[in-house]
């Protein structure tokens, strides 16, 4: 809790953004990481780690090509392997679903 409040005090410039122990849960930490590490490229990995990228339990507008958002196939947890890499190394096989 103290570390989260330290980060929020730095960001807000005062303690107005501090939280209580009751507000600290996994969803809060995931959301805070999304804000704090916005340009660092961690969001997709975090969503995969917590099984939220492809599931329907966590949606955002236009997820899955639907305006209200929807779950998508689990194949999207992995990227396709480029054909140039597979041509260079015949031991590579394409990730499932691609």
Outline where the language-model segments fall.
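Acidic/polar-rich alpha-helix caps and helix-coil junctions
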Residues: 1-98
């Amino acid at each position: 809790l103290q570390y989260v409040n330290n980060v929020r005090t730095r960001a807000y410039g005062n303690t107005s953004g501090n939280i209580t122990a009751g507000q600290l849960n996994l969803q809060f930490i995931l959301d805070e990481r999304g804000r704090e590490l916005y340009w660092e490229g961690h969001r997709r990995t975090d969503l995969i780690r917590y099984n939220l990228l492809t599931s329907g339990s966590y949606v955002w507008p236009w997820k899955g090509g639907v305006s209200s958002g929807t779950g998508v196939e689990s194949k999207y947890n992995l990227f396709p392997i480029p054909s140039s890499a597979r041509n260079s190394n015949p031991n590579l096989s394409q990730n499932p679903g691609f």
